[in-house]
């Protein structure tokens, strides 16, 4: 077997770093606009460019376009403002009900809504909709609305007090980056075939257990320190850009 390298296409961890690089550059030039205009413009552009039929993996440009509204909103809104708005008890109750409803719908109707998954990966255009391409922008907008709503609902029920998982929550970047190593090892071994074959009804329990262990390993001090060292220049850039 031969291994080929494409210098312009990245589907692993590096795409995230590349996307962050371009997002910081874009934000440097858009910070002069009013936040509401910048946010609306980023959403509209993502809705329109979904019609493209070009290679969407080159420089990860499609994922940059689709995920930039989340990045931009996190850039312009302070955590203090979000916390103040989400402290309302009615919102917390609505969040619990909404999240339970969301998970029930996903669990019960996953076969009917799984076709929308490509919109969440950010890599594909509306051509995946086949006969529904005309409604692509509206579907994309709906996905944005639901995604932002779910994010804010999660934030509203997050406890203020720290507990055992709080430290790992602060190190989510290192978990994201280094868990790929364990995925590659898992796929290279025969476990992904052996477990479902040997334990057809309980193999998913092993996956959950492995996932928990991997999360704790990747959330330790050393992986986190390495990620912070790599991202330190980006943090300094962000502070300078806001001045």
Segments from the language model and where they lie:
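Alpha-helical transmembrane segments and their immediate juxtamembrane cytosolic regions
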Residues: 1-243
């Amino acid at each position: 077997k031969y291994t080929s390298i494409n210098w312009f296409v990245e589907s692993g961890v590096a795409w995230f770093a590349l996307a962050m690089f371009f997002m910081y550059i874009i934000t440097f030039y858009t910070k002069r606009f009013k936040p509401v205009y910048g946010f609306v413009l980023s959403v509209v552009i993502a809705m329109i460019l979904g019609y493209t039929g070009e290679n969407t993996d080159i420089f990860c440009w499609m994922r940059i376009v689709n995920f930039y509204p989340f990045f931009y909103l996190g850039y312009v809104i302070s955590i203090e403002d979000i916390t103040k708005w989400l402290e309302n008890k009615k919102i917390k109750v609505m969040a619990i009900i909404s999240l339970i409803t969301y998970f029930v719908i996903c669990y019960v109707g996953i076969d009917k809504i799984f076709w929308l998954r490509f919109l969440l990966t950010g890599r594909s255009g509306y051509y995946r909709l086949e006969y529904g391409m005309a409604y692509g922008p509206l579907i994309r907008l709906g996905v944005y609305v639901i995604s932002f709503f779910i994010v804010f609902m999660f934030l509203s029920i997050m406890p203020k007090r720290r507990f055992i998982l709080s430290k790992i929550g602060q190190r989510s970047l290192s978990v994201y980056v280094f868990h790929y190593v364990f995925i590659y090892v898992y796929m290279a071994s025969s476990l992904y075939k052996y477990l479902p074959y040997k334990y057809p009804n309980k193999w998913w329990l092993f996956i959950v257990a492995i996932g928990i262990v991997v999360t704790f390993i990747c959330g330790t001090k050393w992986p986190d320190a390495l990620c912070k060292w790599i991202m330190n220049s980006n943090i300094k850039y962000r502070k300078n850009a806001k001045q």
